[in-house]
Amino acid sequence: MPNTKFIWFDGKMLPSEQAQVHVLTHALHYGSAVFEGIRAYACADGTSAVFRLEDHCKRLINSAKIMRLEVPFTAEQLVAACIETLKANKLPEGYVRPLSFVGHGEMGVYPGNNPVQT
């Protein structure tokens, strides 16, 4: 699997080495995160087909709601971010893993007003 050069993080496309989280990020200590695993397939005509991308993005948001996390992006924005990430990395096929998590801020079981990062 090739290394990705770019990662979409909190609404911005970043060089992968700049996409970092603080060591006291709530999700690292309490598992306060949700994710999806999405497969993109290369097509014979040179394009990509991403399997049920919109459904995956909606499910990510619904999973976050179950955990009382408010994802700061719409499903449509997440769909665009996944496609943009594949294009930025020049990947006609691959595995996309959107992740939303409670970021750095208050520690303890209840994260209070910590940001939800995606």
Predicted regions and their residues:
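Conserved alpha/beta cores of soluble small-molecule-handling proteins
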Residues: M1-T118
